[in-house]
Amino acid sequence: MAIANKNIIFVAGLGGIGFDTSREIVKSGPKNLVILDRIENPAAIAELKALNPKVTVTFYPYDVTVPVAETTKLLKTIFDKLKTVDLLINGAGILDDYQIERTIAVNFTGTVNTTTAIMSFWDKRKGGPGGVIANICSVTGFNAIYQVPVYSASKAAALSFTNSLAKLAPITGVTAYSINPGITKTTLVHKFNSWLDVEPRVAELLLEHPTQTSLECAQNFVKAIEANQNGAIWKLDLGTLEAIEWTKHWDSHI
């Protein structure tokens, strides 16, 4: 998918990886970049607008934990304005295993609900044109950081959901792929809580090993968007981009 002249919705497009990715997207010249985020950041929006004045950048406040009906109402406002949307990026995420319910609500349920809501506008069974979904998951969906089992499990769930979405594309007309960053230098990983304090130094220990910058991750994210490969499980780690093969251990045969 060429980003140029496309309409893109980016949930959590002002976060660590999110904001650098928004910058890279804007440089690629979409027609519209609609950012949905919990907290407004006028300076960040102004920066994006200045980066490429030809791109229309808009912001709507959005908390992914709201009911599906509320998300659908917001999306209707956006679709009424833009008429078409080509790509939805689900990027909301928190890393704090003290907050068990919220971790699951943001990292998994929020992704499911936002996706469910946009199907009202995209699903070809309802006369929709189809669309593309990029879900930001995590390498912890492959192998957990066991000191943060709630976070890791929430990302594994989001990855499984995304893989299923891709398989459903012939029915819905909506394709999907996952973006799975490795350890990336953002405020998210500088300090966070392990489950039941099993490892108080978990953030410090992780950062003792090689990491990548959010810019490196963002640049590879844009490459994945342009590749537009349904069902791809993209690993974005140490400044590299790799489509991994998922090992199948069981099949439902349906």
Curated annotation (Swiss-Prot):
GO molecular function: alcohol dehydrogenase (NAD+) activity
Record-listed NAD(+) binding positions: 10-33
Catalysed reactions, as listed in the record: a primary alcohol + NAD(+) = an aldehyde + NADH + H(+); a secondary alcohol + NAD(+) = a ketone + NADH + H(+)
Active site: Y151
EC category name: oxidoreductase
Subunit (UniProt): Homodimer.
Protein name: Alcohol dehydrogenase 1
Organism phylogeny: Eukaryota, Metazoa, Ecdysozoa, Arthropoda, Hexapoda
